[in-house]
Amino acid sequence: MGLRVVFMGTPEFAVPSLRRIAAMKPQFETVLVVTGCDKPRRSKNSPPEPTPVKQAALELGLPVLEADDVSSHEFALQVAAARPDVIVVAAFRVLPPEVLELPPLGTFNLHGSLLPAYRGAAPVNWAIINGDAETGVTTFFLQKSVDTGNIITMDRTPIGPDENAFELLKRLSEIGAGTVERTLTMIADGAVMPEKQDERFATKAPKLNRENTRIDWNQPVQRLHDFIRGLALKPAAWTTFGGKSLKIYKAKACAIETAPDEPGTLRIADGRLLVAGTDGWIELLSVQAEGKKAMDGELFARGLRARKEMLRFL
């Protein structure tokens, strides 16, 4: 039997890595998959559903542990019973030292940025929001302080000029599977040369919330475009219109010669829904009004044509 691997993860981002590890037999044996508990995922009233990682693990015939409280001693005992040589983590929770120190070959994490850049919960989103041209994935040994452990290896990739967070996250999950495979091979071969993170280049990627996903229209069009695509499709950038929230999923810079009005002002031109930034206009391509289904910008614009007053997003 090869090295015993315990895998921990929950969302779709972690699934390609789990599948890659499962395919690495006999060099590596996935002895346990730890994930979140079944819960309603479509809406509060929908029936409980398994996590994407649990679904994949069951398809692969792997043993699953649904973890509720990862800080409990009982959880540490359950993981210890699997006798892991190494623990692989991808988009899971913060683990206590009691768990991190169980495997003799260490516990490592797959992170969706080029560390030490974008430490935190939303690295993919903030890389796009900030207009970065490049990002990547990093594997590093976990320690008590979040996202600060020694780097094992990383892979880089360009960010497309119109690529959104949903698309980039999916792409990074596939790239990351290869990074995890290489990391495990390096560990098995004793070829890891851990590198300390340079604190001079450390930046944060804070958790997304209602406040930091609201659009400030008093910005250049390119910044607005990056902000909107950096939050698509979830949780989505939003603004206020007519006293209600409006989610914006997709937009693009609009090349028209007319000078922009006050930032946030709406204009309908040839059926297109335009909004003023500080240096031009941005066209809204996909929106969702509060309590309604998503629709394209042109359809939303049709409902505004009869209104004669100046319309603005706040």
Curated annotation (Swiss-Prot):
Record SUPFAM superfamilies: FMT C-terminal domain-like (SSF50486), Formyltransferase (SSF53328)
Keywords, alphabetical: Protein biosynthesis, Transferase
Molecular-function GO term, any one: methionyl-tRNA formyltransferase activity
Any single Pfam family the record assigns to this protein: Formyl_trans_N
Annotated organism of origin: Chlorobaculum tepidum (strain ATCC 49652 / DSM 12025 / NBRC 103806 / TLS)
Top-level taxonomy: Bacteria, Pseudomonadati, Chlorobiota, Chlorobiia, Chlorobiales
Gene3D superfamilies: 3.40.50.12230
Annotated positions binding (6S)-5,6,7,8-tetrahydrofolate: S113, L114, L115, P116
Name of the protein in its database record: Methionyl-tRNA formyltransferase
One Gene Ontology cellular component: cytosol
Family of the protein in this entry: Belongs to the Fmt family.
Broad EC category: transferase
Catalytic reactions of this protein: L-methionyl-tRNA(fMet) + (6R)-10-formyltetrahydrofolate = N-formyl-L-methionyl-tRNA(fMet) + (6S)-5,6,7,8-tetrahydrofolate + H(+)
Record-listed E.C. numbers: 2.1.2.9
Source superkingdom: Bacteria
Function: Attaches a formyl group to the free amino group of methionyl-tRNA(fMet). The formyl group appears to play a dual role in the initiator identity of N-formylmethionyl-tRNA by promoting its recognition by IF2 and preventing the misappropriation of this tRNA by the elongation apparatus.
